[in-house]
């Protein structure tokens, strides 16, 4: 009998368990001399993205009241799913531990007044800032700057996520600016909200 190492195709036998393995799966060693068939970490076949909440503000604007005063950003009336809750204040609460994708949209701008506005937005988890602040300096009296962002986050049940905006007085920043809704006059086109959020996960 030939040694196994010397056997060539088509006489080489298939991997252990392949006859009953599901299509698209791979054999992964368990470190104890055996293994199991499952979905490969780089093979997303069979996975779909589940949309959990999809909120947007209906406010004409979201502007902090004065310089250096924080305003929590809201995303509409709120929505609830089993894994995630979005309330009317803009707070996202994680109900089920897992990995989530958070997608954001903000319409930053200003209306009227002279001088340069200095606008910052930040994210907070359980009341503590995470990541860096995002900054805009807006010198025109009529300006609109769209901003989008997304992140995958592994979060435990009970975690609360919020977003804040501020008109900063640093560098002679003026009391102007915030988030603004815009409405197309062309029939059939939807409003662009001042702020929107979507939370998703793989299932």
Tell me what each language-model feature is.
Residues 2-42, 115, 168-171, 201-203:
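Extracellular repetitive beta-rich solenoid segments
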Residues 41-203:
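Extracellular jelly-roll beta-sandwich "head" domains, especially the C-terminal globular C1q domain
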